[in-house]
A protein has these predicted regions:
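Surface-exposed acidic/polar loop and edge beta-strand patches at domain peripheries
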Residues: 17-182
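Short, Lys/Arg-enriched N-terminal segments with co-localized hydrophobic residues
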Residues: 1-16
Length: 182
């Protein structure tokens, strides 16, 4: 079903997929960030950063067959670090706002980091969109994982989040989210 035809090129159940990893830049804190390029046999591709689990490019043929990027992305690490819109990113622990930055769970009140006036937005001051994720290539998929520790941004419990990206010969992007908490 599976064999590696060359470095980072895979044939999985008869489908060719090329996955490459390149340096993208360095964060303000000195962490190296990589960009992953998933390309099908027709040459259409997606690019994903391990910083914020961000989609950077989706290049597919337009109606005339010309390769066209249909994803709103940026070109530099500093642009992503200063991005208030979370372009292409996985946000969290919560997407959107938590009014006044607090909630009650099982009778206990939790106070979260506030970053939008008095509100908590998209995970707080350092949400998932602003972190490096661990990345690995498995078969024809890119798997990104991060751990949010108990107390991070004020949230209770440890959380492990895994996001798996796939890219098909039909130019279909698949994204699978899996989370577990204690």
């Amino acid at each position: 079903d599976y064999y590696c035809s060359s470095a980072n090129s895979y044939v999985w159940k008869g489908v060719f997929m090329k996955i490459t990893k390149s340096d993208f830049g360095t964060t303000n804190t000195g962490e190296n960030i990589n960009i992953y390029h998933l390309e099908n046999e027709a040459g259409a591709y997606v690019e994903i950063l391990n910083f914020g689990c961000r989609l950077v490019k989706i290049v597919v043929p337009d109606r005339n067959g010309n390769p066209t990027d249909v994803c709103l992305g940026m070109d530099t690490m500093s642009a992503y670090e200063n991005d208030d819109a979370s372009l292409g990113a996985v946000v969290g622990r919560v997407a959107n706002r938590i009014k006044d930055g607090h909630f009650t769970l099982n009778g206990k009140e939790y106070h979260l980091a506030v970053n939008c006036g008095t509100n908590h937005l998209h995970g707080g001051l350092i949400g998932y969109a602003s972190k490096p994720w661990d990345a690995k290539i498995k078969d024809d998929k890119l798997i990104l994982t991060m751990i949010s520790a108990d107390g991070e941004e004020g949230y209770p419990g440890n959380l492990t989040l895994t996001v798996t990206y796939g890219w098909s010969e039909d130019n279909e992007l698949s994204i699978v989210y899996e989370a577990s908490a204690d």
